[in-house]
Amino acid sequence: FGLLSGIIFVYISYNYPRKGIFTIYTIVLLLFFTLMGGAYLPWFISSISMAILADIILSVFGYDRAIPQVASWALMQLGSAAGQWIPIWFFTDRFRQDWIDKGQSAATMDAMIHYAVGIWGIISVLVVASLSMIGVLIGRKVLKKYKK
């Protein structure tokens, strides 16, 4: 998501450089997911927290500058992904059992947990951050002519 939607992020940064714009963007996105039945508290907390931090970074360092855009979008994507990782990292047994109770197999859950912790967890964080950063750089290249 971070790679593909980096263009949208850059477009908003260029054309609507207002404090709180990405916090509002995140809240609207979360509301849509809530209406579809896919939201839960850790995801809300981590997503909104990182959106607030991204808004602060952009308002202090500039909405049209590359480094603040790259850092902010990476933080927002990590915040969104952390909503998925937090239950696994801190409540592994409960997370596993809840999903088994919902019909997932124990083997599937064990594989999911394996790839969310330890070295694979670190790799996941790096991949999400890297793809988000690349998404912003692509967005800046594509939307250069639309910059106000």
Indicate residue ranges for each PLM-predicted region.
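Membrane-helix interface "capping/anchor" motifs
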Residues: 10-22, 40-41, 61-68
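Hydrophobic transmembrane alpha-helices
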Residues: 1-27, 31
